[in-house]
């Protein structure tokens, strides 16, 4: 009896860390359950809004230990879409994203701060236009659970703002238009 109890305790202690580890997810871009949208003030009177149509990524997440989360995202900057072909051509030019030279933007998390109630700050290295700088994303875990197709999903929203000049974007649109606001909607399917 003592041997069985000892074996159960040892076995349980070895399995416990695995049960508490983060699950790995792939961002569900194919099912259109994720989006990366942006807005920039237009002369201080309105906003130009747009999105990136082609991106991919993955993340690890455990609701019991959000600080262990990891996020990796790649964005095809050629896929920028502001609903205006001529403007998109200009955004892809050397004045803005310089997609001929830098066709990809990336975000790789370096830390996650748990703020409670599903809120967190995800800090990482954001590379855009060939420049890499730290960027903090205010994020919220929306929910997670089984889907109707037998998979398991986790969803998040996030926002961040950055100055265009910090990423070597040459075009000066004036002080009212100096920053880009990103809105992120992410739904991942557990691998």
Curated annotation (Swiss-Prot):
Family matches, as NCBIfam families: PRK03757.1
Subcellular location: Periplasm
Keyword Signal in record: yes
The entry's keywords: Periplasm, Signal
HAMAP family: UPF0312
Claim: Nucleus is one of the keywords in the record: no
Pfam families xref list: YceI
Protein's name in the database: UPF0312 protein Shewmr4_1178
Primary location group: periplasm
One GO term describing the cellular component: periplasmic space
Family, per entry: Belongs to the UPF0312 family. Type 1 subfamily.
Signal peptide: 1-22
